Each structure stands twice: as C-alpha cells, then as structure tokens.
C-alpha cells in the first residue's frame, strides 16, 4: 500500500532535519530540464506566471538561480521535512521516530511540479512550481504535458517492486491529475474528510488538508499495510462512515463539537 500526497508551497528551510538518512530524487534529470527554463524567467515574469507578489517572485528567482546539483545534506533537505503546509503539520514528521519515518519512506510518495514524484527522504532544494501552473515548456503548454506518463510509470514501478496493489490518494485534484489513472496498475482509494458545520457535513479545505496528514501519521504510528485498517482512523475526532462511502471513496466524518 502506498499513499500519495501533494507538496506544500510553504517551506521550512531553516530548521535542521531530525534524521540524517536521505535519498536522491528519481526524476532529477527531468527537474533539471524544467529548472533550466525557470532560470530564464525574470522576477516580473514569475509574478505573472505564478500569480504571486513581487517579493515572492524575487525570492523564487533567487532560488532558481541558486538551484544546483548534486544535492547534498549541506545544500538540500529531505522533502518531508522541507514541506510545511497544512498536510505536513497534520503529519508532523519531526515528532515521528526513525522506524515511523522509514515507514513513510517505504509507503508514501509526494507529487511535485518540479520533482515529479518524491520519496519522503529525497533531498530537495527550495522551489515554487505548482502542478497547475500554465508553464509552457519543451514538451507542451503545461506541466501535465511535461510529465506525461512519467509519474504514472514511476508509481507503477514502485508499486510492482513493493508487491503492492493499492494506492491511497491523499493528494489534491490539481496534483493527482498528473497521474494517469487509466494506466495506473493499482486499486485506487480516495479518503474524503468531512466536518460538521451548522448541522451539515461538508469538506472544509483547511481541516481536510490537515486530516490527510493525520491519516499518514496514523498509518506510520500503527505500521499499517492493510488498507482496511485505515477505516479505524480516529485521530482528532474523525470516524469512518460506511453508509456514506463506496469501494473507492472512503468518507470520514467529524462532529462539530469534537474539535
């Protein structure tokens, strides 16, 4: 069983990683192709392309200029400790022990606009390139065309090597669109997290993102390899709702008063 997650825009570059183990991204040669093009963009072009402030555009122009291989622990950081958004706050990998972190390495993959598909302990350098960015490149008009079936093929290889036939999709639609589900050789399960508000259950983005990270943490802490065991997920008041679920979409609900 493998999980896929989206990356995060916010990055934690300052704090040292709690573990020394690391791996290298499998698709770094592809990343280098993209970065060569990104380096050609002036800050104003980055601001327009990514719809960000001049300050953020300048920061990322500097990141692009400084991006260089080979990646080492001195100039890069493991992805699971670099990403710093809602999902990763829910996962809180910094407080997992080494056995649990190795579980993440063996069961979790992170989608990325620049790096394609990452293992949690893959070293990365800071960047900003969301998968949905309309970044015209050598292979097409956007990143979905750039990556084509590369991410899907690597996922299939990863699943096959592990003898796994289940992929748990905890990524956003923007990122999971980079996976060709028609060519994916795995059973696909998509957990959906709903919170009660004014008597009705709905997906609330912040809570849903955090819950995705919580589920991965739950799996790591319990060393889950059987997807059915995920139905026992109960962190922060969530509970599996069988009546609202089907074979491929598993719904977890949380009552308003529990938060």
Curated annotation (Swiss-Prot):
InterPro entries: YaaA. GO terms for cellular component: cytosol. GO terms for biological process: response to hydroperoxide. It holds the Pfam family H2O2_YaaD. Belongs to the UPF0246 family. HAMAP family: UPF0246 (MF_00652). This is UPF0246 protein NMB0895.
């Amino acid at each position: 069983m493998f999980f896929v997650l989206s990356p995060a825009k916010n990055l934690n570059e300052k704090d040292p990683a709690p573990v020394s183990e690391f791996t290298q991204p499998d698709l770094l040669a592809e990343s280098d192709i993209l970065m060569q093009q990104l380096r050609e963009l002036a800050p104003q072009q980055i601001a327009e392309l990514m719809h960000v402030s001049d300050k953020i555009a300048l920061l990322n122009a500097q990141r692009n200029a400084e991006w260089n291989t080979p990646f080492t622990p001195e100039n890069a950081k493991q992805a699971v400790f670099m990403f710093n958004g809602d999902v990763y706050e829910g996962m809180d990998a910094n407080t997992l022990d080494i056995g649990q972190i190795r579980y993440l390495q063996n069961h979790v993959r992170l989608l990325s606009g620049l790096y394609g598909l990452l293992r949690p302990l893959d070293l990365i350098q800071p960047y900003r390139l969301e998968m949905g960015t309309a970044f015209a490149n050598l292979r097409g008009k956007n990143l979905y065309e750039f990556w084509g079936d590369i991410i899907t093929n690597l996922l299939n290889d990863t699943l096959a090597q592990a003898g796994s036939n289940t992929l748990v999709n905890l990524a956003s639609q923007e990122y999971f669109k980079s996976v060709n589900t028609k060519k994916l050789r795995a059973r696909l399960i998509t957990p959906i997290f709903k919170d009660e508000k004014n008597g009705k259950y709905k997906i609330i983005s912040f809570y849903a993102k955090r819950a995705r990270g919580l589920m991965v943490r739950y799996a790591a802490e319990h060393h889950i390899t059987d997807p059915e065991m995920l139905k026992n997920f109960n962190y922060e008041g969530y509970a599996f709702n069988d009546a609202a679920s089907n074979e491929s979409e598993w719904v977890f609900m949380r009552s308003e008063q529990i938060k």
